[in-house]
Structures are given as structure tokens and as C-alpha cells.
Regions:
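N-terminal secretory signal peptides that target proteins for export/translocation
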Residues: 1-6
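N-terminal export leaders
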Residues: 9-13
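C-terminal motif of bacterial Sec signal peptides marking the signal peptidase cleavage site
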Residues: 19-22
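Bacterial signal peptide processing site
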Residues: 24-26
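Post-signal peptide N-terminal segment of mature Sec-exported envelope proteins
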Residues: 28-60
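Extracytoplasmic
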Residues: 214-230, 239-301
Length: 301
């Protein structure tokens, strides 16, 4: 009898230890990882992730919804709306992105750690805290310019492990394109309201760097004030090396073909616009996507 009781007690102890171990595993902090990932479909549009340490884009920024708080991000982290993070459809994860609100001149660095935005007409999705510092209201959309901070992004990538699962060849999904565009300063740029110069404004700065600086979970909340440079909204459908192909597409979607680049080596882009509001731009983008131009996007110029 005594032996049976001892065995029973030992079994209960082992079960308790196993349960504690399971709780420890479930409660363990997620480990961020470096990833590029496979082509995927979101919001009815295919996206093709790739490494790009020189990406510069313009477009409209969205603010992450409250319902995403606490969920697992694409690179293994748990979403925290209080951190300076963002989602991007194609960039390597993580990456450091310099985001400028063109409507008020405020600039802030964020860490890209997720895919998105779900809306195909948005170029980046900002955490609540990042959006607040940039003066972007939840539920709204703001004209932004985004640029990868190359050195910081490479250092971040070097300090993280690669994902365990192999990557699929991009040919497994329909062929798409990722556009890149540099935004030249607007000749009609005006100072942001209430701003007299372009000196850095530090609203709040995190503590001194730690040994984990190569994989920061919290970027400093350093906001820089510059000049407001709001532009005009366009839907950019595609880019071609031949004028006749661009004109053919433009005729099919009600746009126009524009030459750009150095003389003698011009390329031709198809655009619709300028569009007078975000709502009008969204409708034009929706029509263009329905016409089968899957790489179309909203840009600011």
C-alpha cells in the first residue's frame, strides 16, 4: 500500500512539473527573427517580399487598429501599440524606416516588424504610438514619404536568426512588381504650421543603449520637425520601357503615359490623376485593380 501511494505521489509530481513546464513554454517571450517570406495575397492583391535597403516610397499611411494589440506579428514578436513599429507589404523584417508626414513635416524612425497594411491603397501601417507622434489620427490617412535607414537595417538583420522554414521561389505566385520612387522636394514647399525652423525636436528619448542595441525592441521617440510638403495624389498603375505599351495601358484604364528618367533612356509610367481627395484616390485605385493592374498603388507627387 505504501509503495503504491509513493508511486502515485511521484506520478502527480511529474504531472505538476510537466504542467509548469508547459506554462513556462507558453509564457515565454517570442523570439524575433529575420525574414523576407514568400509571395502572399492580402486585400485582394499579391505582394512579393524582397530585401531592399534602398527603398524610398510615397503614399498614404494607415494606423493599426486596436484589435491587433497582443497578436503575433509576422517576424515572431507580439504587437504592442505603444512601440514605434510598422507594417509594410514587401520589406525584409525587421527594417528601420524613416517616416515623414508630408502634411506637417514631422519625421520619425519606426521598426518594420509585420506585413500589411491590409488596405492596398496604403503604403505603411503605423502603430498607435508612432501615428500619434507623427500627428496621424486613427482611422485617417496621411501623405507620407518612407525611406529605409540602410545602415541601421543591415545591423538589425545581422543580429537576428533566419527563419527555420525554407523560402519558396517567387515564381510560385503570379508575377508582380515592386515600384520605387524618389520624392524630389516640392518647389512650392511651405513651412509646417507653427514651425519656424528645421531643428530636431526631441519629445522623449528612451534610455541609453544596451548590449541588445542590434535588436532594439524600443526605438527612441525622437521626432524631427521639418517643412510640410503636401503633394497631389495619383494612382500609379505600372512602368514600361516602351511608350506604346504605356499608352496602351493608359487608354484601357483612363490614365496617361508619362516619360521620366534621363534623356535617351526614358521609361514610361501610367498614372491617373491628380486626384482631389483620399476617397477619390481609393476609388480610382479600386477601379484600376479591378481592371487587372495588380501592381497599381497610390503615390504622392
Amino acid at each position: 500500500m505504501t509503495g503504491a501511494m509513493a508511486l502515485a505521489r511521484r506520478g502527480l509530481a511529474l504531472l505538476a512539473l510537466g504542467a509548469l513546464a508547459g506554462c513556462a513554454r507558453r509564457g515565454a517571450a517570442p523570439q524575433p527573427r529575420y525574414m523576407v517570406g514568400d509571395p502572399y495575397r492580402l486585400g485582394g492583391v499579391w505582394s512579393y517580399p524582397r530585401e531592399d535597403f534602398g527603398l524610398v516610397q510615397t503614399g498614404l499611411a494607415a494606423v493599426a487598429a486596436d484589435r491587433r494589440a497582443g497578436r503575433r506579428m509576422s517576424n515572431g514578436e507580439v504587437h504592442d501599440p505603444a512601440l514605434l513599429t510598422a507594417g509594410h507589404r514587401t520589406l525584409q523584417l525587421p527594417a528601420i524606416l524613416c517616416v515623414t508626414n508630408l502634411e506637417n513635416g514631422l519625421t520619425l524612425d519606426v521598426r518594420v516588424n509585420d506585413r500589411g497594411p491590409p488596405h492596398p491603397g496604403r503604403v505603411v501601417e503605423l502603430s498607435r504610438r508612432a501615428a500619434d507622434l507623427l500627428g496621424i489620427r486613427p482611422g485617417g490617412a496621411a501623405q507620407v514619404r518612407i525611406a529605409v535607414v540602410a545602415e541601421a537595417s543591415r545591423a538589425l538583420a545581422a543580429g537576428l536568426p533566419d527563419p527555420e522554414t525554407p523560402r519558396l521561389d517567387i515564381s510560385a505566385a503570379p508575377l508582380g512588381a515592386v515600384e520605387r520612387e524618389d520624392l524630389a522636394p516640392s518647389p512650392g514647399a511651405v513651412p509646417a504650421r507653427g514651425i519656424r525652423d528645421a531643428r530636431p525636436l526631441v519629445r522623449e528619448t528612451a534610455g541609453p543603449p544596451t548590449a541588445a542595441a542590434t535588436t532594439p525592441q524600443r526605438l527612441p521617440e525622437r521626432v524631427t520637425r521639418g517643412f510640410a510638403q503636401p503633394g497631389r495624389l495619383f494612382v500609379e498603375a505600372a512602368t514600361f520601357g516602351r511608350r506604346d505599351l504605356a499608352q496602351q495601358q493608359a487608354a484601357g484604364i483612363g490614365g496617361r503615359a508619362e516619360a521620366f528618367g534621363p534623356r535617351g533612356r526614358e521609361n514610361f509610367r501610367v498614372r491617373i490623376g491628380p486626384l482631389t481627395s483620399v476617397e477619390q484616390a481609393d476609388l480610382a485605385l479600386e477601379r484600376t485593380l479591378r481592371a487587372g493592374v495588380s501592381e497599381a498603388r497610390i503615390v504622392v507627387d
